[in-house]
Amino acid sequence: MTKLLVGLGNPGDKYFETKHNVGFMLIDQLAKKQNVTFTHDKIFQADLASFFLNGEKIYLVKPTTFMNESGKAVHALLTYYGLDIDDLLIIYDDLDMEVGKIRLRAKGSAGGHNGIKSIIQHIGTQVFNRVKIGIGRPKNGMSVVHHVLSKFDRDDYIGILQSIDKVDDSVNYYLQEKNFEKTMQRYNG
């Protein structure tokens, strides 16, 4: 079996560790722990790394299409490898959750998230496993765009790093147990 772990974000140094890139941050942490490096694949429009865990090939994916076109890379990879939707796990930021809170879901709407909207449009379903990481709402009249493309303040950054560790644990648990329902029960709280 093969699994695709896809972190959403925007490519380039300009967006490094911005709120919208928490999905990339988690995928980078998984790659570091597995001691694997990314290579860019022009056909899939993504940076890819892979490793084996319990005989299963795991792909770490960072789409390079920019957030709003993430579905292109996800669809291309699912199609090429002949994978089911159950083999997909998307990790991304959520404005409507407080900073650092995580929520695992097996289905749902885009909730205003353009990366998720693109994935739903390209794969044709809202039913796929996902992990949302809270980045909070904009404060003091800041626009949503400015908020998601800004970096975390010091306190929020510490909280995000802790939540990324928790998501890392949940992803590893999911890969070991091969059961997303059980993973949701354990990590949603």
UniProtKB/Swiss-Prot annotation:
It is found in: Cytoplasm. Its EC number is 3.1.1.29. The active site is at 20 (proton acceptor). It catalyses: an N-acyl-L-alpha-aminoacyl-tRNA + H2O = an N-acyl-L-amino acid + a tRNA + H(+). The record marks 93 as: Stabilizes the basic form of H active site to accept a proton. Keywords: Cytoplasm, Hydrolase, RNA-binding, tRNA-binding. PROSITE patterns: PEPT_TRNA_HYDROL_1, PEPT_TRNA_HYDROL_2. The record marks 10 as: Discriminates between blocked and unblocked aminoacyl-tRNA. One of its GO terms (cellular component) is cytoplasm. GO terms for biological process: protein quality control for misfolded or incompletely synthesized proteins; rescue of stalled ribosome. InterPro entries: Pept_tRNA_hydro, Pept_tRNA_hydro_CS, Pept_tRNA_hydro_sf. Monomer. Hydrolyzes ribosome-free peptidyl-tRNAs (with 1 or more amino acids incorporated), which drop off the ribosome during protein synthesis, or as a result of ribosome stalling. TRNA binds at residues 15, 66, 68, 114. Belongs to the PTH family. This is Peptidyl-tRNA hydrolase. The lineage of its organism: Bacteria, Bacillati, Bacillota, Bacilli, Lactobacillales. The gene is pth. It is an enzyme of class 3 (hydrolase). GO terms for molecular function: peptidyl-tRNA hydrolase activity; tRNA binding.
